[in-house]
């Protein structure tokens, strides 16, 4: 998954972008880049390989401005080269775009643009978004609304326009984006780890939403142009949760934190006298729980491994047959779903795309939805009726 950061405010944007990208390095990447708005132009720096290569480039070719976007890329469409790194720009240098996801109609859009005489400079699907935006008129937010019906796939996009040097526009369908609300500044990122050191007030974008972000305000829009009214959330995390805390890397930190992580998770659901488990706040009625006949656990990666253990515990304690599915396969095996099934999505971030898709399908089939996750307010959190928050350090 790519890392995305966008900033508009009073500070020089290059240090903000580089710091945000460092905090997103755990995602893995093969190139990095940034776009900085200057009077009547967009300044672009891109580099193959590690983030330090981009840092060196920025040192030798300093950029100045207070609005910009940055990106770490894991190649999907196009080889991991400088030309395919993000940001991608349109032919006229009007629009710069960073993108996480995959456009499924990439081939048809590319052919259409080539047939119209557009000269493409990369092999990426991201450039197609920039070119489509560049062919529209009006403010950047309006341009986004015009092209959204043409985008098929999963995407999180942050864009800037040289005509609007005080604006960053973000939109998503699938991969997560979060807006951080500061004082005289606002930030967009693919993960709160990139912004938590600057603000704890955030708005999580939902699928199909557009955020028009300026230094003094954020406007949320639907795809039809109507306004979304949503109050920000205040994260109660200790900023140290997303730092290495003196460890050489996050993996080592997480290993040493496991005893406390298990203890804190268990204590959160014990009665005050520690003689029993209190699940009163899980959100299901007694009638809903009484009619359950099966449990489905859906997850990916190491969350799936945890579900394999959870299956034995659930069956032992409840007597309910419990199935464990890799979330990416769950949608394709036609599982038996109904009101007597509890589907639990297990996802650390609450944003794992396949797990979310499995939960959405199960909910549409009438199943009860629960989630075990680490991020209050995440997509999985909002999908589920019942939530079990793991009160542990932020994991990578």
Short names for language-model regions:
Residues 1-249, 253, 257, 263-296:
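Conserved short alpha-helical segments that host acidic/polar catalytic motifs at enzyme active sites
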Residues 20-24, 173-176, 204, 310-316, ...:
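Short, solvent-exposed amphipathic alpha-helical segments in soluble enzyme
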Residues 128, 152-153, 195, 281, ...:
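Short acidic loop-to-helix transition motifs that present clustered carboxylates
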Residues 129, 331-347, 353-354, 363:
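N-terminal small/polar loop signature for handling phosphorylated ligands or for N-terminal nucleophile
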Residues 176, 263, 267-269, 273-276, ...:
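Anionic-ligand anchoring segments at beta-strand to alpha-helix junctions in alpha/beta enzyme folds, i.e.
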Residues 303-309, 351-358, 380:
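Short glycine/serine/threonine-rich phosphate/pyrophosphate-binding segments
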Residues 376-384:
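Glycine-rich, charge-decorated loop segments at or immediately adjacent to ligand/cofactor-binding or catalytic sites
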Residues 395-396:
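Conserved small/polar residues in nucleotide/adenosyl-binding loops
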């Amino acid at each position: 998954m790519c890392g995305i950061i966008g900033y508009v405010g009073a500070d020089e944007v290059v240090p903000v972008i580089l710091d945000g990208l460092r905090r997103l390095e755990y995602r893995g990447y093969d190139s990095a880049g940034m776009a900085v708005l200057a009077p009547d132009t967009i300044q672009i720096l891109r580099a193959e390989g590690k983030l330090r290569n981009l840092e060196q480039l920025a040192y030798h070719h300093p950029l100045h401005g207070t609005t910009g976007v940055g990106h770490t890329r894991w190649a999907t469409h196009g080889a991991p080269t400088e030309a395919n790194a993000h940001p991608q720009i349109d032919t006229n240098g009007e629009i710069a775009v960073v993108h996480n996801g995959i456009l499924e109609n990439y081939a048809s859009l590319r052919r259409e643009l080539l047939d119209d005489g557009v000269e493409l400079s990369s092999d990426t699907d991201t450039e197609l978004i920039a070119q489509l935006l560049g062919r529209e008129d009006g403010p950047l937010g309006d341009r986004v609304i015009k092209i959204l019906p043409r985008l098929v796939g999963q995407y999180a996009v942050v864009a800037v326009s040289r005509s609007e040097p005080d604006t960053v526009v973000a939109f998503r369908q699938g991969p997560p984006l979060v807006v951080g609300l500061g004082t005289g500044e606002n930030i967009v990122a693919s993960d709160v780890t990139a912004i938590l050191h600057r603000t704890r007030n955030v708005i999580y974008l939902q699928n199909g939403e557009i955020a028009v972000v300026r230094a003094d305000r954020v406007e949320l829009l639907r795809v039809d142009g109507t306004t979304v009214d949503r109050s920000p959330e205040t994260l109660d995390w200790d900023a140290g949760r997303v730092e290495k805390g003196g460890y050489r890397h996050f993996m080592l930190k997480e290993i040493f934190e496991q005893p406390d992580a298990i203890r804190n998770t268990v204590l959160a659901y014990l009665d005050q006298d520690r003689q029993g488990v209190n699940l009163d706040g899980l959100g299901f009625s007694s009638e809903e729980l009484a009619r359950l006949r099966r449990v489905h656990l859906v997850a990916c990666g190491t969350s799936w491994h945890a579900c394999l253990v959870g299956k034995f515990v659930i069956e032992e304690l409840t007597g309910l047959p419990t199935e464990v599915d890799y979330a990416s396969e769950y949608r394709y095996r036609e599982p038996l779903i109904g009101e007597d099934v509890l589907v639990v999505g297990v996802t650390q971030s609450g944003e794992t795309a396949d797990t979310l898709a499995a939960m959405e399908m199960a909910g549409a089939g009438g199943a009860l939805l629960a989630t075990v996750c680490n991020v209050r307010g995440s997509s999985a959190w909002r999908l589920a009726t019942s939530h079990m928050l793991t009160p542990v350090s932020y994991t990578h």
